[in-house]
Regions:
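Primarily recognizes Gram-negative and organellar outer-membrane beta-barrels
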Residues: 1-187
Length: 187
């Protein structure tokens, strides 16, 4: 468990006089976990060159921060308060790419596909209600397919290809899909 401690003093002056003094003592901890996985293959099967790579990553962090604040000055006189926040983040990432290629007369033909998916959940909660709470989720995904032909002319090389890509981004606020911030593209 990683734990941090911050002790800070902020003072505001107006016309050379102390207007407000804010003393904050913060403690925070960030326990978390991370897991990752990778799978790959690079080789040949019946004259086809195959290059495959896939990754997965999962992270989970939780942070609790407690601030003991003491405010004094000519406007507020003296006030003490505790501000407690809980912040959680969860991430999932999956990505894969496959390229297969084969020699053809006077060149090489390659076919491939890519895929990625990312999901992020965040929550922010203030027990005392001093700071607004927040809960958001983002889902991103991309899928593509491509074909490419390569031909060599002595020291020169010519490439021609086509690629199609679908990209989606979805944003959720407190569990509700937000259309204005969610986008989809087909290229």
């Amino acid at each position: 468990k990683d734990e941090g401690y911050i002790n800070q003093l902020a003072q505001t002056f107006c016309d050379g006089q102390l207007y407000e003094s804010l003393h904050s003592m913060l403690t925070e901890n960030e326990p978390g976990s991370s897991r990752r996985s990778n799978l790959y293959y690079n080789g040949k099967i019946k004259g086809w060159s195959i290059d495959f790579n896939a990754d997965a990553l999962w992270t989970d962090t939780k942070n609790k921060q407690t601030a003991q604040e003491s405010v004094s000055g000519s406007v507020n006189h003296h006030a003490d308060r505790t501000v407690t926040t809980h912040d959680t983040k969860r991430n999932e990432l999956y990505a894969a790419k496959l390229v297969v290629s084969h020699p053809v007369p006077k060149g090489e033909l390659s076919l491939g596909a890519e895929y990625s998916h990312n999901k992020r959940n965040t929550t922010y909660f203030n027990a005392e209600g001093i700071i607004g709470n927040d809960e958001a989720m983002i889902k991103e995904g991309a899928t593509s397919a491509f074909v490419e032909y390569v031909k060599k002319f002595n020291n020169l090389q010519m490439q021609a290809g086509l690629r199609y890509e679908h990209v989606g981004f979805n944003y959720y606020d407190a569990g509700k899909w937000v259309a204005e911030q969610s986008k989809t593209y087909h290229n």
